[in-house]
């Protein structure tokens, strides 16, 4: 079977570049995002499947992996790309917004990694990458 990648938190920034790179290397691409309607162009460009997923919701993540299992089996690579930008100085950041950002970047990453690792360990193969989304490569991060 062809090598495959699941990109969680897909959009038109860093994850789009990664999707194109993986496609160019012959990998089957699956894109996951809260709003898959925004992925129409990327889906077409990469021949990807898309799955709706809120990475901070246990049931949504479990559903993502059940659907991924049916489409590509256990992915060779899972990329966790969601982020939530806060901006501003630490003294000005709303604590509720900070909690939301931590939920997306940390807890969501844990949920995705847990589901991916369970499958990858059984197959004795696979990699999980965590990005900082596009914010990690721009000056405002």
Give the predicted meaning of each segment.
Residues 25, 71-72, 88-89, 115-124:
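A short helix-coil junction within the Rossmann-fold of NAD(P)-dependent oxidoreductases
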Residues 45-59:
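Rossmann-fold cofactor-recognition segment
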Residues 27-40:
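Conserved glycine-rich Rossmann-like NAD(P)H-binding loop of the short-chain dehydrogenase/reductase
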Residues 64, 79, 108, 112-116:
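Hydrophobic positions on the long internal alpha-helix
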Residues 127-141:
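Catalytic loop of short-chain dehydrogenase/reductase
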Residues 11-12:
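Conserved glycine-rich cofactor-binding loop
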Residues 84, 91-111, 129:
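Catalytic Tyr-X3-Lys loop
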Residues 79-87:
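Conserved NAD(P)H cofactor-binding loop of Rossmann-fold oxidoreductase domains
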């Amino acid at each position: 079977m062809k090598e495959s990648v699941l990109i969680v938190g897909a959009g038109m920034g860093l994850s789009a570049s990664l999707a194109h790179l993986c496609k160019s290397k012959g990998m089957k691409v699956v894109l996951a995002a809260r709003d898959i309607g925004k992925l129409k162009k990327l889906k077409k460009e990469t021949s990807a499947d898309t799955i709706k997923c809120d990475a901070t919701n246990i049931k949504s993540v479990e559903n993502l992996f059940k659907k991924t299992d049916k489409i590509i089996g256990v992915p060779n690579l899972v990329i966790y790309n969601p982020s939530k930008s806060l901006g501003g100085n630490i003294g000005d950041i709303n604590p509720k917004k900070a909690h939301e950002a931590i939920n997306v970047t940390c807890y969501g990453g844990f949920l995705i990694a847990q589901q991916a690792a369970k499958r990858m360990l059984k197959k004795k193969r696979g990699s999980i990458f965590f990005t900082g989304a596009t914010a990690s490569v721009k000056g405002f991060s």
